[in-house]
C-alpha cells in the first residue's frame, strides 16, 4: 500500500508537487508485477476533506490515536509551530487536521454510524488496474 497526500489545495503547492512526483515514479514501474496488487490511498491534510460520497476507506480514531497523530505531526518540523505557508488559516497544522477529522466523525454520526472521536478518510486511486 502507498499513502500520499491528495490535498491539492495546499497553499504552497507542496502536496501537488509530491503527488506528481509519486505518480511519475509509479508510471515508471507500472510493469512490475507487484504494482498490480498495490493499493494507492490518498488522504487530505488540513485544508479540506473528501466528500463522503468519494470515500473508499474510513478509519475511526480513538482519543489516544488522535494524540498519537498530533505527535506524529509534531515530528514534521515543517508542520510544527508557525508554518511558513499557512494560507489564510493561521492555526497550527495539527489543530486544523484534528478539526477536520472530528468534523468528519460528526458527519458519519449524523448518518447513523457509530460515534468516534475522529475519522480519517481515504480515497483509493486506481492507477493501472
Tell where the protein language model's regions lie, with residue ranges.
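Metal-dependent de-N-acetylase/amidase catalytic core
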Residues: 1-129
Amino acid at each position: 500500500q502507498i499513502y500520499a497526500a491528495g490535498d491539492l489545495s495546499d497553499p504552497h503547492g507542496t502536496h501537488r508537487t509530491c503527488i506528481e512526483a509519486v505518480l511519475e515514479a509509479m508510471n515508471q514501474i507500472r510493469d512490475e508485477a507487484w504494482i498490480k496488487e498495490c493499493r494507492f490511498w490518498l488522504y487530505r491534510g488540513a485544508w479540506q476533506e473528501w466528500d463522503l460520497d468519494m470515500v473508499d476507506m474510513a478509519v475511526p480514531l480513538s482519543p489516544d490515536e488522535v494524540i498519537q497523530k498530533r505527535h506524529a505531526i509534531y515530528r514534521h518540523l515543517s508542520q510544527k509551530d508557525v508554518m511558513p505557508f499557512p494560507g489564510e488559516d493561521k492555526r497550527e497544522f495539527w489543530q486544523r487536521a484534528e478539526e477536520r477529522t472530528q468534523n468528519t466523525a460528526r458527519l458519519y454520526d449524523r448518518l447513523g454510524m457509530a460515534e468516534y472521536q475522529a475519522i480519517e478518510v481515504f480515497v483509493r486511486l486506481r492507477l493501472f488496474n
